[in-house]
Amino acid sequence: MSQIEHHPQDDTLFSYAAGSLPAALALVVGCHLQVCSTCRSQVRSGESLGGELMTALAPKTLSDRARANVLQRLDMQQSQSDCEQVSVGSETIVSPAAPVKGVMPSLLQKILKEQDFDALPWKKTIAPGLKQIVIDCDEGQARLLRITAGQKMPVHSHRGSELTLILSGGYSDTLGQFNAGDVADLDGSTEHQPLADDDMDCICLAGMDAPLLFKGWLAKLIQPFVGM
């Protein structure tokens, strides 16, 4: 099992607990929670605090967006319940959904109707060494990316927020090395160029609330065809 080194920012986790993250970003956090007990604990703390605040407020009718967020969270929590660590005596049993290279989180399996990354209908893009699967989301963009081993992504920054969860393989950039289970929580202040590890393809789940900002004329030229 990989040791998780990179987690979502605290404000991202509390926004998730409050149900205020756009759907694409919430999907990434939900999949990360399935393999990270540290972040699950933080989200539970945020939910407890939110519950206490709600009881102190006068009841109000939920907006359509708030209701949709609540229903989505309930669905995610149901999937996460299968991923809890269960202590038995002095031993700790970790579910198979732990961050092992090549293992797809059960929440993503439910959406994609598949368990094997290699069996997915990957679509080639005009960008060299990059395949993707677009995931329908009501808010933001979510997609599964497959970067060929040893291949670089174009240099880019962000017009908004981006969350990327490594599912298999890994990549490195100016922020460090990212492996299975790690999350890159990025905003407009970050410019980077992920480089996939040499030993295997890097598969990751990316969610964003605004398109990326590519650097260089060639990257800008192909951006409309990639869709990010």
Each language-model region and where it sits:
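Short beta-strand His + acidic residue motifs that chelate non-heme Fe in jelly-roll/DSBH
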Residues: V43, M153-V155, T174, H192-D197
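Ligand-binding loop in jelly-roll beta-barrel domains
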Residues: T190-F214
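Positively biased amphipathic helices and basic secretion/translocation or surface-docking motifs
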Residues: M1-D11, A23-A24, S48-F117
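Glycine- and acidic-residue-biased ligand/ion/polar-headgroup-sensing regions
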Residues: T148-Q151, H158-D173
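Short acidic-glycine-tyrosine-enriched beta hairpin
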Residues: D173-Q193
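Short cysteine clusters
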Residues: C36-C39
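Conserved short histidine dyad/triad with adjacent acidic residue
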Residues: T125, K131, D136-H158, D187-E191
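Sequence/structural segment immediately N-terminal to covalent heme-attachment motifs in c-type
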Residues: V29-L33
